[in-house]
UniProtKB/Swiss-Prot annotation:
Its main location: cytoplasm. It is an enzyme of class 6 (ligase). It comes from Listeria monocytogenes serotype 4a (strain HCC23). Catalyzes the condensation of pantoate with beta-alanine in an ATP-dependent reaction via a pantoyl-adenylate intermediate. GO terms for molecular function: ATP binding; pantoate-beta-alanine ligase activity. The keyword Secreted does not apply. It is found in: Cytoplasm. Pathway: Cofactor biosynthesis; (R)-pantothenate biosynthesis; (R)-pantothenate from (R)-pantoate and beta-alanine: step 1/1. The reaction proceeds by a bi uni uni bi ping pong mechanism. This is Pantothenate synthetase. Beta-alanine binds at Q61. Keywords: ATP-binding, Cytoplasm, Ligase, Nucleotide-binding, Pantothenate biosynthesis.
């Protein structure tokens, strides 16, 4: 595995693979890798000839009340997992490499962000599409791999790729879970022992919501209340940041229960905010 830190070296390495008619699979991450990330790598390994992973904690997607400096980082750990997983290039740029000067033009997401994390984290998805536009141009992948757990981000990135004609096939991979159903996340390390024991209730509640919808229930308030009651059976969380249903990928109110729907949850614990979701009537690409 080659570790690359600057743009020019990356572009030259990618060009060499393109000239050899190799397909490129790309897994963008913010590091602190876990099994969920490595599942994305596994799919990329199977479906493309050459796998690129980036590890970059992107400052433009952190809000004023979010601690960019406190985000967990462990490059040695990430490099070890990436190499073991079959990554060919690990791109680990500095902030200065990606943002050498103040941006003269800025991207602004106008749809799919007025609810959930988009509502709570103003400007967050603007930062996501900004950095991905830069990284997509540098890596020039055939396939890019994202996890379903970040479903709103996936919807936003899908819009970016469609709007700006990126010749990239987005591959959306099912959420990787612990044995008890908790979605794998870098933030799980912040849970106390009691919180970790109770956190799987988030997924249990989402499955209850799925079951109700698939059995024909269309009373949104009832569905949300059933899920809320389920989560509140385990009292270690501080609050439920959101628990909601929307059309997917539009993130508008549900009007047709036979089309794509997302049930999304965010639950705040003492030192971690966990998100999870279930997609209904949605085909992953």
């Amino acid at each position: 595995m080659l570790i690359i830190r600057n743009k020019q070296d990356l572009k030259e390495a990618i060009l060499k693979q393109k000239q050899a008619n190799k397909t490129i699979g790309y897994v963008p991450t913010m590091g602190f890798l876990h099994e969920g990330h490595m599942t994305l790598v596994s799919h990329a390994r199977k479906e493309t000839d050459f796998v690129v992973m980036s590890v970059f904690v992107n400052p433009t997607q952190f809000g004023p009340n979010e601690d960019f400096d406190a985000y967990p980082r462990d490059e040695a750990h990430d490099a070890k997992l990436a190499e073991e997983g079959g990554v060919d290039i690990l791109f680990v740029p500095t902030v200065e490499e990606i943002y050498p000067t103040e941006l003269a033009t800025k991207l602004h997401v106008t749809k799919r962000v007025s609810v959930l994390d988009g509502a709570d984290r103003e400007g967050h998805f603007d930062g996501v599409v900004t950095v991905l536009t830069k990284l997509f141009h540098l890596v020039n992948p055939d396939n890019a791999y994202f996890g379903q757990k970040d479903a709103q981000q996936v919807a936003v990135v899908s819009g970016l790729v469609e709007d700006y004609f990126f010749p990239i096939n987005l591959r959306i991979i099912a959420t990787v879970r612990e044995a008890d159903g908790l979605a794998k996340s870098s933030r799980n390390v912040y849970l106390t022992e009691k919180e970790r024991k109770e956190a799987p209730v988030i997924h249990e509640a989402l499955l209850l919501g799925r079951e109700l919808i698939e059995s024909g229930e269309t009373n949104e308030a009832k569905i949300v209340q059933v899920m809320t009651d389920k989560i509140n059976e385990q009292p270690s969380h501080e609050n439920i940041a959101y628990l909601a249903l929307y059309s997917y990928p539009e993130f508008t109110p549900v009007t047709d229960w036979t089309k794509g729907i997302i049930i999304a949850a965010a639950v705040k614990y003492s030192k971690a905010r966990l998100i999870d979701n279930e997609l209904i009537n949605v085909k992953r690409r």
